[in-house]
């Protein structure tokens, strides 16, 4: 099902409002989002060694991502507070060996957040917030090593459940 081009956050008078979900069915929902952090070889090595001044970068980022999912409705004004029944945060190094710059290869960390609920509305924003928060935490913990890190490609990878149906990003989609 294609998304409706009209925003559901505006009423007939054009005023902002929170969408009324009282009439919707409770369904099992899952969303997967990801973010990438490009960093210097020194920053990547610090993560791999696990010996940064602030502690285990990935463990702290994982906790921050989970907390981010739980706080989404406080951060995004029109998000519903939904029961978050599961959140997982995974990290993997992206092989960018096809990059024109050999120094960039294997210095990109991908954070993937998966969130699940049984609710009347989706959990996409929670998974996006989790991935973003985890990536920001990696930046915070390594900024003394590399202030030029770049966070990009914060995006929804897939979602399932609900009236609008399932979504899965095309693997060839660069955006």
From Swiss-Prot:
<keyword id="KW-0456">Lyase</keyword>
<keyword id="KW-0501">Molybdenum cofactor biosynthesis</keyword>
<dbReference type="Pfam" id="PF01967">
    <property type="entry name" value="MoaC"/>
</dbReference>
<dbReference type="InterPro" id="IPR023045">
    <property type="entry name" value="MoaC"/>
</dbReference>
<dbReference type="InterPro" id="IPR002820">
    <property type="entry name" value="Mopterin_CF_biosynth-C_dom"/>
</dbReference>
<dbReference type="InterPro" id="IPR047594">
    <property type="entry name" value="MoaC_bact/euk"/>
</dbReference>
<feature type="active site">
    <location>
        <position position="140"/>
    </location>
</feature>
<comment type="pathway">
    <text>Cofactor biosynthesis; molybdopterin biosynthesis.</text>
</comment>
<dbReference type="InterPro" id="IPR036522">
    <property type="entry name" value="MoaC_sf"/>
</dbReference>
<comment type="subunit">
    <text>Homohexamer; trimer of dimers.</text>
</comment>
<dbReference type="GO" id="GO:0061799">
    <property type="term" value="F:cyclic pyranopterin monophosphate synthase activity"/>
</dbReference>
<feature type="binding site">
    <location>
        <begin position="125"/>
        <end position="126"/>
    </location>
    <ligand>
        <name>substrate</name>
    </ligand>
</feature>
<comment type="function">
    <text>Catalyzes the conversion of (8S)-3',8-cyclo-7,8-dihydroguanosine 5'-triphosphate to cyclic pyranopterin monophosphate (cPMP).</text>
</comment>
<comment type="similarity">
    <text>Belongs to the MoaC family.</text>
</comment>
<dbReference type="GO" id="GO:0006777">
    <property type="term" value="P:Mo-molybdopterin cofactor biosynthetic process"/>
</dbReference>
<feature type="binding site">
    <location>
        <begin position="78"/>
        <end position="80"/>
    </location>
    <ligand>
        <name>substrate</name>
    </ligand>
</feature>
<dbReference type="InterPro" id="IPR050105">
    <property type="entry name" value="MoCo_biosynth_MoaA/MoaC"/>
</dbReference>
<protein>
    <recommendedName>
        <fullName>Cyclic pyranopterin monophosphate synthase</fullName>
        <ecNumber>4.6.1.17</ecNumber>
    </recommendedName>
</protein>
């Amino acid at each position: 099902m294609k998304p409706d081009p009209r925003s559901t956050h505006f009423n007939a008078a054009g005023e902002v409002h929170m969408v009324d979900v009282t009439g919707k069915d409770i369904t099992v929902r899952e969303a997967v989002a990801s973010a990438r952090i490009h960093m210097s070889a020194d920053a990547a090595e610090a993560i791999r060694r696990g010996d940064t001044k602030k502690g285990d970068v990935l463990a702290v980022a994982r906790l921050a991502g989970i907390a981010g999912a739980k706080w989404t409705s406080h951060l995004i004004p029109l998000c519903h507070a939904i029961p978050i029944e599961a959140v997982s945060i995974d990290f993997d190094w992206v092989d960018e060996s096809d990059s024109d710059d050999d120094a960039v290869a294997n210095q990109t960390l991908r954070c993937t957040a998966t969130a699940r609920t049984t609710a009347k509305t989706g959990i996409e924003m929670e998974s996006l917030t989790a991935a973003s928060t985890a990536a920001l935490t990696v930046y915070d913990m390594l900024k003394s090593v590399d202030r030029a890190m770049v966070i990009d490609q914060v995006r929804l990878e897939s979602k399932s459940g609900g009236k609008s149906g399932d979504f899965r990003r095309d693997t060839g989609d660069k955006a």
